[in-house]
């Protein structure tokens, strides 16, 4: 798999389109950190770490809905393996005039765009969520 974050975002997007309550994805530290930000910002209910029958780590994600509609309306990958996107703290864009969130991988960890601005740190813009 060339893009594990992109794969996870696609699984979430597809599961919400089908109305699923949970979705599982192979586990990794970076994926868990991205899910931490999504949970902190209120886009998912949470996630649980487990292992499959072969002993590989798995993340079981609990999706969130409001009045039957998915909370996540748009989920876009920004920085891709073929084209990395790095931005300084002043260049990190606001998503939909501040209604959405950019998830940024910084030297201080993976965080939302608002946290990156408050910590005065830039980094790789992984994805945007609205």
Swiss-Prot record:
Function (record text): One of the primary rRNA binding proteins, it binds directly to 16S rRNA central domain where it helps coordinate assembly of the platform of the 30S subunit.
Organism lineage: Bacteria, Pseudomonadati, Pseudomonadota, Alphaproteobacteria, Rhodobacterales
An example Gene Ontology molecular-function term: rRNA binding
Gene: rpsH
GO cellular component, one term: ribosome
Any Pfam family the entry gives: Ribosomal_S8
Key words, A-Z: Ribonucleoprotein, Ribosomal protein, RNA-binding, rRNA-binding
Protein name (database record): Small ribosomal subunit protein uS8
BP GO annotations: translation
HAMAP family recorded: Ribosomal_uS8_B
Source taxon at top rank: Bacteria
């Amino acid at each position: 798999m060339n893009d594990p974050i992109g794969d996870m975002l696609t699984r979430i997007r597809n599961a919400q389109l089908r109305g699923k309550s949970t979705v599982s994805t192979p586990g990794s530290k970076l994926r868990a950190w991205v899910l931490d930000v999504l949970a902190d910002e209120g886009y998912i209910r949470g996630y649980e770490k487990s292992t499959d029958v072969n002993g590989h780590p798995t993340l079981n994600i609990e999706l969130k809905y409001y009045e039957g509609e998915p909370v996540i309306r748009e989920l876009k990958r920004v920085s891709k393996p073929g084209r990395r996107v790095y931005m300084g703290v002043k260049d990190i864009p606001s998503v939909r005039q501040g209604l959405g969130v950019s998830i940024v991988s910084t030297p201080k960890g993976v965080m939302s765009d608002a946290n990156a601005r408050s910590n005065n740190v830039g980094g790789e813009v992984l994805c945007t969520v609205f």
